[in-house]
Amino acid sequence: MVGAVGTASAQYFGQNKVQYEQFNFKTFETNQFDIYFYPSERQAVEDAARMAERWYDRHSRTFLREFQKRKPLIFYANSPDFQQTNAVQGQLGQGTGGVTESIKERVIMPLTGSYAETDHVLGHELVHSFQYDIALRKNNEGFSLRDMPLWFIEGMAEYLSVGRTDSHTAMWMRDAALREDLPTIEQLTRSQEYFPYRYGQAYMAYIGGKYGDAAVTDLYKMSGRVGVDSAFVYTLGITADSLSAEWKQATRETFLPAAKERTPVDSIGKAVIGNPGGEYQLNISPAVSPDGRYVAFISRRNLFNTNLFVADAETGEIVQQLEGTRSNPHFDALRFIDSAGSWSPDGRKFAFLTFAEGRNEINTFNVKTGEIKTRTVVEDVGAIHNLAWSPDGQHIAFSGLQGGISDLYVYDLEAERARQLTNDRYADLQPTWSPDGETLAFTTDRGPNGTNFETLEYGEERIGLINVESGKIRTIRPFSTGMQHNPQFSPDGRSVYFIADQDGFKDVYRYDLDEKATYRVTKIQTGASGITALSPALSVARRSGRMMFSVFSNGGYSIVGRPAEKTEGERVAPEGEASTAAVLPPVQPTGGGLVDSYLNDPLTGLEGLGPITPTKASDRLYLDRIVPPSVGTSVGGTFGPQVAGGVGFMFGDILGHQNLSVFVQANGTIKDIGGGVFYSNRKNRMNYGVSVSHQPSAFGQLGRTANGNFVQIVQRIFRTQVGTQASYPFSQTNRLELGLGGTRYGFDVTARTFSRFGRSRRIDLPGAERDPLYFGRASLAYVGDFSNSGLTSPLQGGRYRFQVTPQFGSRNYVSVLADYRRYFFREPVTFAFRGLHRGNYGAGQFQGGITDLFVRETLGDPYQIGFVRGYSFNSIFEEPKCQRRGICRIGRLYGTRMALGSAELRVPLLGPEVLSLATFKYLPTDLVLFADAGVAWTSEDLTEPSFSSNTIGQSNPNASGSVAAQPVTSAGVSARVNVLGAIILEAFYARTFQRSKNWDFGVILRPGW
């Protein structure tokens, strides 16, 4: 995955990336890479370093390029650790296998527990590293990576790391061909409907097969200079449209004949969950109850949440579901891509995996009540995959990762401790119990022709059987080729069901342990599969033998059921069937096959590391980027000739823990030079930062003296601030913020006269001098954000911020803020509600001095948080009565305190098909019906609020400085438009109830609240 990194800044709202653990990073060098790791993963990382050097050799031959300096590789031992990384900004979902970023050209990734999968991810990310190395070098100025479509970038990385033989991608292409939805290059580029990894890989395989693999990298190099469409012509001598037509024809000819001889998806069994004819569904990880009556599964039933459901295994009716992860305080997310849950033997409870507090937890769920009964953290196990509840109900088996290496464990529920069954570098995944509780079947790469850790040559997945008591292991490989995984015992324990792709199709098979014979249970046109090639997709009821499995079709996943009597299957030969069904077209490449050559050669480029002496990872700051210097000049105007400019420098350490920003801004004279230094540290769970800044602002006016000379008056305000802020996240959705700081406001007034002959002199302005103001502050805030954002505003969930900020110095008071927002999504609309209060307590009345500006809260500023639509100051000042008098009384719109309530009905008018009433993704637009009500007052005024109308423009603070509490209200309609992802514009038309002007039109540049 290609990523970019930015500098963190404080947020009013926003979710948290929590650093639950401290990782003691070490580093060592290889020929081409700086390797970063922590001690617990050393063995696996040393092997990964050898993989990286081999991939460098492969990719350097493919790209005909060598690195000029070593690149950083940062390894995490597992996915929960990886999700805490600071090297990548923002949240990382469990579907992110790795990131390559452009600023420091780092590869950041977790180890997967399977050497083969880790090698694939590393090879994929290092393609991105070569892509960046080409795009970012000075000798390639004018090279544009930004304009390349995602399918092109990711498809190239997938093809160069996997090759053309891939049953999972072949399944996707077969499905698209069957439903006549093979995309053109233009559709891939413009539409988000097509998964860029799979379709991009298929296109790149076609290009490499027809024109030679060198053409793939040549196409990339040319695309960065002339654009992708032109690059096809210059590099391949064919237009993108013609290539699309060729690829579509070749894909149909390759996949359709064999697919049409197999069982259509709607005939392989009873569709229980989802509709095989429906598009883009997600129903995965089935786990059928022991009696076969119910099935637990993971599904995305709305735009936002992937959740756990329990359904009737015959009808598909939902009987229970887990509380959504956004509103559940116990965990951050379900683990579902590489794991399935397990039922207790009595069928009353269901165990599943979550991400919580930086690690995986085993949760048990009361199926009847929907209540989470237990939460279990297994000590000394970094990550957990695939639970299996024992027949006696006393143990749960699982695959656990420690130091990036997977092993089998059995957890004793009563003793609350785990026993490790295996202890080696082989992949040990997807355990399941035999009916007698003596044996675990699991997926592994051990055994004859298994993984060789010296040559890093990987054995294909097969079935392992381990005696739980003795630890003795034997392997079963029903077919000599292909992946064989996801074992499930039959109720009598005499057979093992599994999924295999030995003939290029992913089907369910049965292996008879007594006969040592294999039987085909399904013959599906597309395939039995989960999200990834190795995701769990099959479950068999422990007592009844009912089978449930997920099927890929129409670009999505449905769950199909079969009764026990239809799971016997037809006997097949152990050698399987010769087939090219897993090969992406062209099946017989005519170009140079460099990719196939190096994928079949594990030794070339593989070298030993030699003696390694890791050292502590440096916390040195490196210059990340320079905000481009700018210089401008102006002649004339209020300030006369001026020179202005600015530059910024941004620094960070290699692990992303520290960020330092330095900015300098100049506007005119030495007095007008400003700047700031901002430092943040996110190494620990308590994030903190310090800042120092100086910001001058100048305001000028021109006039004439009695004798006709010009007078230039320049007023300056100098704001100098120092502050520190800390944030302690309790979870991804809530945090505590602390702040301390001080501000000095200095004032300067200069005046010069200019004669008609150009002579000037400085003059004094009696009484213009002003003493500086000083403020100190301390703040405490509790912030929560469990919202899901749309394209112009939040759609679901909620946000809140409660803050107290004592201010002391030139004026003493306490600022209080309470801001609470809720969003209720009822497809396709959202009902949004907000309540807000801001008050400066202890500030007293308005005193007529400059400090009033610091305690004033307004309802009439469109860019303040408390704006009531229809009552902007600018709009009121334009009213005829204000224009006639030259003064306009707007006291009703400000006070030392304010309160606001808003409600909106948000209708997604234009946007992506999945979200909007009409598809037009280029200018997403929401139609909004709104109602606002606000009131501003000072400390003595809220006793008798008045809703009288037509008083705006007439009321002002009374002689004592107080403001009467007179609410203002409005209702109307607005349109929020996302303009090219850069700005969000809201145009509103409001009916005002406390203005003589009944209707008001306005425009605001900001996202919806």
Language model features with spans:
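Blade-terminus and WD-like Trp-Asp/Gly-His loop motifs, strongest in beta-propeller folds
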Residues: 286-294, 341-349, 386-395, 431-439, ...
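C-terminal outer-membrane beta-barrel translocator/porin domains of Gram-negative envelope proteins
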Residues: 691-697, 703-705, 711-715, 722-725, ...
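Active-site-proximal alpha-helical
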Residues: 35, 59, 151-166, 174-240
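Beta/coil-rich, acidic/histidine-enriched accessory regions frequently appended to metallopeptidases
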Residues: 12-27, 191-194, 218-332, 336-341, ...
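Outer-membrane beta-barrel initiation region
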Residues: 563-685, 767-795, 911-913, 937, ...
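Repeated loop/turn-to-beta-strand initiation elements of outer-membrane beta-barrel proteins
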Residues: 371, 472, 517, 655-661, ...
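A flexible loop/linker signature enriched in serine peptidases of the S9 family
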Residues: 278-281, 298-309, 325-336, 351-363, ...
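Juxtacatalytic substrate-recognition/specificity segment
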Residues: 10-149, 166-168, 186-188
